[in-house]
């Protein structure tokens, strides 16, 4: 596997791809209106007034979402700190600045809803790019620019760097397990225990691709826009993009179309993708990775530089490398959980959505807090869903 996120600039210094200038200018957003003014003190007072009604949040207003994400990006304490006091202190600033730009005065609940949906979609797409598509860092960045909201929440990747590094570590473990399975199967074939080679199992990889449960929005669309009517369905991708930046389509472990409309791109997203190859490719864009194949030889130990430090108030014990044996045992236990979940889903299909949400909520809760016991976890989940 390749290094996670650095780009050589011709000197010893490297810059993460996500911190390079955008390949093309971002779409313009409404500027602040000097005739609109709303003090944060007044906003805080209204927030405490139960009778005051804030403006409704239109889940289909994409410009509003982008403005909110853009304003949150100007308040690092919201996205780089786990201090709830610091976070809540800055939301009134985001609300009043959003009002100056859109004329809409949103509640803190609506602002947090927009922010959570943006973060969840960002992580989902990163997981698809890193784990399912197994792209290089440059290809991950090009892939992310296909999403029209990426430029307005790109800053959050400062916070996801450790998480992205952990994804790659887990991927290395899975690839090593698959290679060892293939090696053992070949040994059994050679000894006559098996009549023909068995293909590597992909179940462990599938488990790694569980999507985060987004904040539910009726009618909301955070997906890539649908294709323009003039675009021919028979047009080949090669006619639109440089060959070096065509994303792999065959032999994918995970199909992102189950969650997003990724197979189509608007003209603006195509422009982002082409411009990225021209600006960041340096005349020789990294080649698209071929689907991973395995020989009978054990996989070599992966070598990767440690991720660069990020501003994050998290105990270092959270990122202590786990012994391989412990991870292997956990993987086997997850196989059993997956089997039982699928069995229940088949027996009770009408409760599939509820089952999926429950599983996501439990797993993703550990991204938000370091739990000492199961009781705390269940209390938080009960409060969240009450």
UniProtKB/Swiss-Prot annotation:
Residues 229-240 have a biased composition (Low complexity). Changing residue 20 to P: In n111; multivulva phenotype in a lin-15B n2245, lin-52 n771, lin-9 n112, lin-35 n745 or lin-37 n758 mutant background. Increased lin-3 mRNA levels in a lin-35 n745 mutant background as compared to wild-type. It is found in: Nucleus. Changing residue 68 to M: In n2741; temperature-sensitive multivulva phenotype in a lin-15B n2245 or lin-52 n771 mutant background. The keyword Nucleus applies. Residues 212-240 are annotated as: Disordered. Disruption phenotype: Temperature-sensitive multivulva phenotype in a lin-15B n2245 or lin-52 n771 mutant background. Keywords: Developmental protein, Nucleus. InterPro entries: LIN-8. GO terms for biological process: negative regulation of vulval development. Residues 175-285 are annotated as: Sufficient for interaction with lin-35. Widely expressed throughout development, with particularly prominent expression in the germline and in neuronal nuclei of the head (at protein level). One of its GO terms (cellular component) is nucleus. It holds the Pfam family Lin-8. Interacts with lin-35 (via C-terminus). Acts as a synthetic multivulva class A (synMuvA) protein and redundantly inhibits lin-3/EGF expression to prevent inappropriate vulva induction. Belongs to the lin-8 family. This is Protein lin-8.
């Amino acid at each position: 596997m390749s290094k996670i996120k650095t780009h050589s600039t011709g000197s010893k210094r490297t810059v993460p791809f996500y911190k390079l200038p955008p390949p093309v200018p971002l779409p313009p957003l409404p500027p602040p209106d000097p005739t609109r003014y709303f003090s944060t003190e007044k906003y805080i007072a209204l927030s405490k007034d139960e009778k005051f009604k804030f403006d409704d949040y239109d889940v289909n207003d994409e410009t509003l979402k982008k403005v909110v994400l853009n304003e949150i990006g100007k308040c690092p304490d919201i996205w780089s700190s786990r201090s709830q006091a610091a976070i809540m202190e800055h939301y009134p600033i985001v609300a009043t600045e959003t009002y100056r730009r859109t004329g809409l005065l949103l509640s803190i609940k609506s602002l947090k809803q927009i922010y959570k949906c943006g973060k969840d979609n960002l992580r989902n797409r990163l997981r698809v790019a890193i784990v399912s598509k197994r792209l290089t860092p440059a290809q991950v960045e090009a892939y992310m620019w296909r999403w029209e909201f990426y430029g307005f929440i790109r800053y959050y990747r400062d916070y996801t760097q450790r998480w992205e590094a952990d994804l790659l570590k887990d991927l290395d473990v899975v690839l090593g397990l698959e290679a060892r399975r293939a090696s053992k199967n070949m040994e059994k074939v050679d000894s006559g225990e098996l009549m023909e080679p068995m293909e590597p199992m992909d179940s462990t990889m599938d488990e790694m691709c569980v999507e985060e449960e987004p904040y539910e929005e009726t009618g909301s669309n955070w997906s890539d826009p649908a294709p323009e009517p003039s675009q021919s369905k028979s047009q080949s991708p090669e006619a639109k993009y440089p060959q070096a930046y065509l994303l792999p389509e065959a032999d994918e472990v995970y199909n992102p179309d189950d969650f997003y409309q990724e197979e189509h791109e608007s003209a603006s997203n195509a422009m982002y993708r082409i411009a990225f190859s021209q600006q960041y490719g340096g005349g020789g864009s990294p080649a698209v990775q071929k689907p991973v194949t395995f020989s009978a030889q054990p996989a070599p130990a992966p070598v990767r530089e440690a991720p660069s430090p990020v501003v994050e108030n998290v105990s270092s014990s959270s990122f202590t490398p786990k012994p391989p044996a412990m991870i292997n045992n956990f993987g086997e236990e997850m196989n059993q959980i997956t089997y039982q979940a699928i069995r229940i889903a088949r027996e009770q299909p009408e409760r599939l959505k509820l089952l999926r949400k429950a599983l996501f909520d439990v797993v993703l809760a550990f991204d938000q807090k370091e739990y000492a016991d199961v009781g705390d976890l269940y209390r938080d989940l009960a409060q969240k869903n009450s």
